[in-house]
Amino acid sequence: MSVVGSLIFCLDCGDLLENPNAVLGSNVECSQCKAIYPKSQFSNLKVVTTTADDAFPSSLRAKKSVVKTSLKKNELKDGATIKEKCPQCGNEEMNYHTLQLRSADEGATVFYTCTSCGYKFRTNN
């Protein structure tokens, strides 16, 4: 017998064998060459499927390679300045930048850095 996916083929002639769970008795018989296989051979079969990355092409997956998903520390820079009170020192000015860290249907994450004391925090919009 030869197993391809969840299909079971006869080793002698290559014909598709019946589903062992649907066959009465203790054996599975090939309808073409009459080869006999004990049903016990099929009891612990594990079906594992895999696909190549390019098996299901999509325009969304093609765009994924264009979107940068990680940043280095020095790439964040200072960001824009906003009038926002620092919860640590009370300074009225902070730098901020946003990143889309969660799924696209959720808001961006805003990172704040105090221009005075350097305190950092983030909020999820």
Swiss-Prot record:
<feature type="binding site">
    <location>
        <position position="30"/>
    </location>
    <ligand>
        <name>Zn(2+) 1</name>
    </ligand>
</feature>
<dbReference type="GO" id="GO:0003676">
    <property type="term" value="F:nucleic acid binding"/>
</dbReference>
<dbReference type="InterPro" id="IPR001222">
    <property type="entry name" value="Znf_TFIIS"/>
</dbReference>
<comment type="function">
    <text>DNA-dependent RNA polymerases catalyze the transcription of DNA into RNA using the four ribonucleoside triphosphates as substrates. Component of RNA polymerase I (Pol I) which synthesizes ribosomal RNA precursors. Besides, RNA polymerase I has intrinsic RNA cleavage activity. Proposed to contribute to the polymerase catalytic activity and form the polymerase active center together with the two largest subunits. Subunit RPA12 contributes a catalytic zinc ribbon that is required for RNA cleavage by Pol I. Involved in transcriptional termination.</text>
</comment>
<dbReference type="Pfam" id="PF01096">
    <property type="entry name" value="Zn_ribbon_TFIIS"/>
</dbReference>
<keyword id="KW-0240">DNA-directed RNA polymerase</keyword>
<feature type="binding site">
    <location>
        <position position="86"/>
    </location>
    <ligand>
        <name>Zn(2+) 2</name>
    </ligand>
</feature>
<comment type="similarity">
    <text>Belongs to the archaeal RpoM/eukaryotic RPA12/RPB9/RPC11 RNA polymerase family.</text>
</comment>
<protein>
    <recommendedName>
        <fullName>DNA-directed RNA polymerase I subunit RPA12</fullName>
    </recommendedName>
</protein>
<feature type="region of interest" description="Required for RNA cleavage, but not essential for elongation activity">
    <location>
        <begin position="79"/>
        <end position="125"/>
    </location>
</feature>
<feature type="binding site">
    <location>
        <position position="114"/>
    </location>
    <ligand>
        <name>Zn(2+) 2</name>
    </ligand>
</feature>
<feature type="binding site">
    <location>
        <position position="117"/>
    </location>
    <ligand>
        <name>Zn(2+) 2</name>
    </ligand>
</feature>
<dbReference type="GO" id="GO:0008270">
    <property type="term" value="F:zinc ion binding"/>
</dbReference>
<dbReference type="GO" id="GO:0042254">
    <property type="term" value="P:ribosome biogenesis"/>
</dbReference>
<dbReference type="InterPro" id="IPR012164">
    <property type="entry name" value="Rpa12/Rpb9/Rpc10/TFS"/>
</dbReference>
<comment type="subunit">
    <text>Component of the RNA polymerase I (Pol I) complex consisting of 14 subunits: RPA135, RPA190, RPC40, RPA14, RPB5, RPO26, RPA43, RPB8, RPA12, RPB10, RPC19, RPC10, RPA49 and RPA34. The complex is composed of a horseshoe-shaped core containing ten subunits (RPA135, RPA190, RPB5, RPO26, RPB8, RPB10, RPC10, RPA12, RPC19 and RPC40) where RPA135 and RPA190 form the DNA-binding cleft. Outside of the core, RPA14 and RPA43 form the stalk that mediates interactions with transcription initiation factors and newly synthesized RNA. Interacts with RPA2/RPA135.</text>
</comment>
<keyword id="KW-0804">Transcription</keyword>
<feature type="binding site">
    <location>
        <position position="33"/>
    </location>
    <ligand>
        <name>Zn(2+) 1</name>
    </ligand>
</feature>
<feature type="binding site">
    <location>
        <position position="89"/>
    </location>
    <ligand>
        <name>Zn(2+) 2</name>
    </ligand>
</feature>
<dbReference type="GO" id="GO:0003899">
    <property type="term" value="F:DNA-directed RNA polymerase activity"/>
</dbReference>
<dbReference type="GO" id="GO:0006360">
    <property type="term" value="P:transcription by RNA polymerase I"/>
</dbReference>
<dbReference type="GO" id="GO:0000122">
    <property type="term" value="P:negative regulation of transcription by RNA polymerase II"/>
</dbReference>
<dbReference type="GO" id="GO:0006363">
    <property type="term" value="P:termination of RNA polymerase I transcription"/>
</dbReference>
<dbReference type="InterPro" id="IPR001529">
    <property type="entry name" value="Zn_ribbon_RPB9"/>
</dbReference>
<feature type="zinc finger region" description="C4-type">
    <location>
        <begin position="10"/>
        <end position="33"/>
    </location>
</feature>
<dbReference type="GO" id="GO:0005736">
    <property type="term" value="C:RNA polymerase I complex"/>
</dbReference>
<dbReference type="GO" id="GO:0005634">
    <property type="term" value="C:nucleus"/>
</dbReference>
<feature type="region of interest" description="Interaction with RPA2">
    <location>
        <begin position="1"/>
        <end position="60"/>
    </location>
</feature>
<keyword id="KW-0690">Ribosome biogenesis</keyword>
<dbReference type="GO" id="GO:0061629">
    <property type="term" value="F:RNA polymerase II-specific DNA-binding transcription factor binding"/>
</dbReference>
<keyword id="KW-0539">Nucleus</keyword>
<dbReference type="GO" id="GO:0006362">
    <property type="term" value="P:transcription elongation by RNA polymerase I"/>
</dbReference>
<feature type="binding site">
    <location>
        <position position="10"/>
    </location>
    <ligand>
        <name>Zn(2+) 1</name>
    </ligand>
</feature>
<dbReference type="InterPro" id="IPR019761">
    <property type="entry name" value="DNA-dir_RNA_pol-M_15_CS"/>
</dbReference>
<feature type="region of interest" description="Necessary and sufficient for recruitment into Pol I">
    <location>
        <begin position="1"/>
        <end position="69"/>
    </location>
</feature>
<feature type="binding site">
    <location>
        <position position="13"/>
    </location>
    <ligand>
        <name>Zn(2+) 1</name>
    </ligand>
</feature>
<dbReference type="GO" id="GO:0006361">
    <property type="term" value="P:transcription initiation at RNA polymerase I promoter"/>
</dbReference>
<keyword id="KW-0863">Zinc-finger</keyword>
<feature type="zinc finger region" description="TFIIS-type">
    <location>
        <begin position="82"/>
        <end position="122"/>
    </location>
</feature>
<dbReference type="InterPro" id="IPR034004">
    <property type="entry name" value="Zn_ribbon_RPA12_C"/>
</dbReference>
<keyword id="KW-0862">Zinc</keyword>
<keyword id="KW-0479">Metal-binding</keyword>
